[in-house]
């Protein structure tokens, strides 16, 4: 069987702020930014991985979700309690400096981890935790 990841969804509360962060801080491409039926379909991704998209999705975009669940997702996002994404880079220091220069919320400065990587962590404008990892060795 040949199966590959095509896209993943990341909850954001402001498409424009999220686009600025991922485009300007991480150098991602904006692949789609289309409005339709009162929604906005936005996909981004690293230029080195053209076959994988990250869909920036508002909290509870599913029209069938209850108002209380929509509010709960919004609260979890605001508190930074939803899982984010992990990215790898060959130059963590340069990537960290670029992200820090945008004023991103720094959670962890670059540090060596006991399992063989060097990592930092930041929050995107929506509060998602983003880890950036460089293999050591």
PLM features per residue range, with description:
Residues 12-16:
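Short acidic-aromatic low-complexity motifs
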Residues 1-9, 29-123, 133-137:
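Vicinal oxygen chelate
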Residues 18-23, 99, 127:
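Conserved active-site tyrosine of GNAT-family acetyltransferases
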Residues 17-18, 94:
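Short Gly/charged-rich anion-binding patches and loops
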């Amino acid at each position: 069987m040949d199966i590959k990841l095509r896209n993943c969804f990341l909850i954001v509360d402001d498409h424009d702020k999220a686009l600025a962060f991922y485009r300007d801080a991480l150098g991602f491409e904006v692949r789609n930014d289309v409005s339709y039926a009162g929604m906005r379909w936005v996909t981004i991704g690293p230029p080195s991985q053209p076959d994988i998209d990250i869909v920036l999705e508002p909290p509870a975009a599913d029209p069938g979700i209850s108002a209380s669940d929509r509010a709960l997702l919004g609260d979890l996002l605001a508190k930074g309690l939803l899982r984010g994404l992990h990215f790898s880079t060959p130059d963590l220091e340069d990537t960290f400096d670029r992200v820090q220069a945008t004023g991103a919320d720094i959670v962890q400065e670059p540090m060596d981890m006991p399992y063989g990587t060097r990592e930092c962590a930041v929050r995107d404008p929506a509060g998602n935790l983003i880890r950036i990892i460089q293999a050591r060795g």
